[in-house]
A protein has these predicted regions:
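A structural boundary/capping signal
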Residues: 2-4, 23-195
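N-terminal secretory signal peptides and thylakoid transit peptides that target proteins
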Residues: 2-18
Length: 195
């Protein structure tokens, strides 16, 4: 667990840079990639990627609350699979294309995919944070995406464990540890605060 924790911390320090670079091309999938996915992974995987692109096209100009609901619902249809079972590794952070192509991923994969999709739709980076939390009922590490209407507001939590988007103040099952986005990394100020 100590090694996995160190790896996660290391990844989280690099992620803001990766997220900033990745958001630009998050939904621009080449015809070559789409052909490869169709040939190697089949029609269902190809269709999931097309649906992702369609979601972006349809929701890019929608109000933010609708974008949040559509993106959360879209990715929550993907099957939860642990990294060990899915990738044969203790901790693997999949790209949205990998998540959708294989139709499986864990909480980090869901959070990253939601973040990148919302950024590609124009949601400002300063309104989004990926939050590393402790899921108290499961007694394990977990990751969610938060949307802040304003910097000091109670964020809305997009989570693959539940389909409803709720304010952090109503998520007593989550204890935040740290959060990050393309701009930086923040440590939780006081233990016991909700995401």
């Amino acid at each position: 667990m100590e090694a996995a924790s160190r790896l996660t911390r290391r990844q989280s320090l690099l992620l803001p840079l990766i997220l900033t670079v990745s958001v630009v091309s998050a939904l621009e999938l080449s015809s070559r990639l789409m052909t490869y996915v169709l040939e190697e992974f089949g029609e269902a995987a190809h269709q999931r990627l097309e649906n992702w692109q369609r979601l972006h096209a349809l929701a890019a100009n929608a109000p933010t609350d609708r974008q949040l609901r559509l993106v959360n619902s879209f990715f929550n249809r993907v099957t939860f699979v642990s990294d060990i079972r899915h990738w044969g590794q203790e901790d693997y952070w999949a790209t949205p294309v990998e998540l959708l192509t294989t139709n499986g991923g864990d909480c980090e994969d869901f959070s990253i995919a939601k973040y990148l999709t919302l950024r590609a739709m124009g949601v400002p980076d300063d309104q989004l944070r990926i939050i590393y939390v402790k899921a108290l009922e499961l007694n394990q590490a977990h990751m969610v995406l938060a949307w802040y209407e304003t910097p000091g507001s109670d964020p809305l939590i997009l989570d693959n464990l539940i389909n409803d988007i709720k304010p952090a103040s109503q998520r007593n099952d989550l204890e935040p540890v740290y959060s990050f986005n393309g701009e930086g990394l923040w440590l939780n100020r006081t233990s016991g605060d909700n995401a």
